Regions:
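N-terminal, intrinsically disordered, highly charged
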Residues: 1-167
Length: 167
């Protein structure tokens, strides 16, 4: 059980992790303090330590913030909206557009408090952003794979154009 002094020091996610038995109070307080000292979002810090399964963490984050959760293992990358968002913004904010419907862009994020990502991407695209919470390590893998595929496709296109010019 969380004592009243420490309960006031823990953020809502940390309290939830203690209630779920995934961390004790001391671990939660220490993790919060370490994340602040390293200037990392609490969720990123927890993911990087490996103390909590990243899928479970993402699910609890989504529940705690009232946002949808998606297991990226179940997502078909063929349907990713290509070129919906500038590659530099995606890398900067570790965000991945999942699908676009009308003027709404569903965006995979591991940290729902990353308001800068939502604001910048919304400004750049002119679309309403619908955040979807995903596991951080899976997001990173899918983002890199997706961007590498785009770069490889551009390389193929350039070689085809050069061959056509040589003919």
């Amino acid at each position: 059980m969380i004592d009243l002094v420490n309960a006031n020091l823990l953020n809502s996610l940390a309290r939830r992790l203690v209630r779920e038995g995934l961390l004790d109070e001391y671990q939660a307080l220490t993790a919060q303090k370490d994340a602040q000292q390293q200037k990392l979002p609490f969720i990123h810090y927890l993911s990087s330590t490996g103390r909590i399964n990243s899928d479970l963490l993402a699910y609890l984050v989504a529940e705690e913030f009232g946002l949808p959760y998606l297991d990226l293992d179940t997502f078909d990358t063929r349907y990713l909206p290509k070129k919906a968002v500038d590659e530099q913004l995606l890398r900067k904010h570790q965000a991945l557009p999942l699908y676009k419907r009308g003027n709404v862009l569903s965006l995979a994020l591991s940290t729902p408090t990353n308001l800068a990502a939502i604001d910048e991407i919304q400004f750049q695209t002119g679309l309403t952003i619908h955040p979807i919470i995903v596991a951080e390590e899976k997001l990173h893998q899918m983002l890199e794979t997706s961007l590498e595929t785009d770069i490889a496709a551009l390389g193929d296109l350039e070689s085809i154009e050069l061959e056509a010019l040589q003919l």
